[in-house]
Amino acid sequence: MRKRKLGQEMPVPAKTEHNWLDLHTIAQAELSSEDEAHPFEAALSPGGGGWRAAEAGEQTLRLLFDTPQKLTHIRLIFQENEQERTQQFLLRWCSDGQCHDIARQQYNFSSPDSTLEIEEFHVDLHGVTSLDLSITPDISGGHSHASLAEWLIA
């Protein structure tokens, strides 16, 4: 049984329960922005340090698979320790030119109690040619930079 004391952050799930795809070798990425100190590749491995946009505002991250994939699990981890804001993201999958929503969600970051958002999606997707992640870092229109701690796919 997993347990935690009230008021503490939710622990990051163990990294070994899935056979995560090696996205570095089976996909290419398209990005709307990237901070050189926090490259996109850093979000594609557990504990990699994460990606951050170089510019404020809405950002799009796209994974284009070299060959169509069967996907069963998608993990997104967002972390914000500095700024209170409400973030929204849209995760979509595409196959044969048709795109479909997986999730559209909002999350309120509020330090020190709510700084980590972990999303686990159990899916049964076949023939996936791309995954798109659109992040609106602050739905109120502030000058926040989007970031993504982890994007793991099995």
Show which residues each predicted segment covers.
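Disordered, acidic Ser/Thr/Pro-rich linker "stalks" and the adjacent N-terminal cap
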Residues: M1-D66, N81-Q83, L152
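Low-complexity, compositionally biased segments
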Residues: D22-T25, H38, C99, R104, ...
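Aromatic, loop-rich ligand-recognition surfaces of beta-strand-rich domains
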Residues: A43-H100, E120-A154
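Extracellular carbohydrate recognition and processing domains
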Residues: H100-V123
